[in-house]
Amino acid sequence: MLLSDRDIRAEIAAGRLGVEPLLENLIQPSSIDVRLDRMFRVFDNSRYTHIDPAQRQDELTSLVEPGEGEPFVLHPGEFVLGSTLEVCTLPDDLAGRLEGKSSLGRLGLLTHSTAGFIDPGFSGHITLELSNVANLPITLWPGMKIGQLCLFRLSSPAEHPYGSAAAGSKYQGQRGPTPSRSYLNFPLPSDAVDAVESR
């Protein structure tokens, strides 16, 4: 069930749902508008010959922060990571879905490529996967509305919500645009397993 504005306000007032800092005018009929933080992760194409999800590639991206009062310019075909200004905390019986803003989509800005789902129990800044599919650069202003968070009530609370030991939560408590930790989804090579077991 998708939560209405009344439900969203009730969850916030009860202290079960956290969106900080929250302005009242960000609550929409069935979502909460989220704003863009000021940090971005840009890809450095000179560090690696290719992207390998199975490998830890710490130098694949670097953190960029525009000067005070300045936008970040996203060029045509460019892909960067951003994050929400708000820290979002979901209880164990609510899941979230991040959607783009219609006005920005009409300009060619994609807010996320595939990862718009937020698990129950998640807490942290939401990382945005920003793409420019337009033919001109797009200026991204820190603090601008960048997306909308829809909230869904589960049929029952999650047995192992995000952040619990059983969930394997790689991004719990993330601050700012957080690079991929996909390598943690791959089994360790046998020599690495031997090294860990010998400790």
Swiss-Prot record:
It catalyses: dCTP + 2 H2O = dUMP + NH4(+) + diphosphate. It holds the Pfam family DCD. GO terms for molecular function: dCTP deaminase (dUMP-forming) activity; dCTP deaminase activity; nucleotide binding. DCTP binds at K101, S102, S103, L104, G105, R106, D119, T127, L128, E129, Q148, Y162, Q174. The active site is at E129 (proton donor/acceptor). Keywords: Hydrolase, Nucleotide metabolism, Nucleotide-binding. InterPro entries: dCTP_deaminase, dUTPase-like_sf, dUTPase_trimeric. It comes from the Bacteria. The record marks G116, F117 as: Important for bifunctional activity. Its EC number is 3.5.4.30. Residues 171-183 have a biased composition (Polar residues). GO terms for biological process: dUMP biosynthetic process; dUTP biosynthetic process; nucleobase-containing small molecule interconversion. Residues 163-199 are annotated as: Disordered. The keyword Nucleotide-binding applies. SUPFAM superfamilies: dUTPase-like (SSF51283). Pathway: Pyrimidine metabolism; dUMP biosynthesis; dUMP from dCTP: step 1/1. NCBIfam families: dCTP_deam. Homotrimer. Belongs to the dCTP deaminase family. Bifunctional enzyme that catalyzes both the deamination of dCTP to dUTP and the hydrolysis of dUTP to dUMP without releasing the toxic dUTP intermediate. This is dCTP deaminase, dUMP-forming. It comes from Nocardia farcinica (strain IFM 10152).
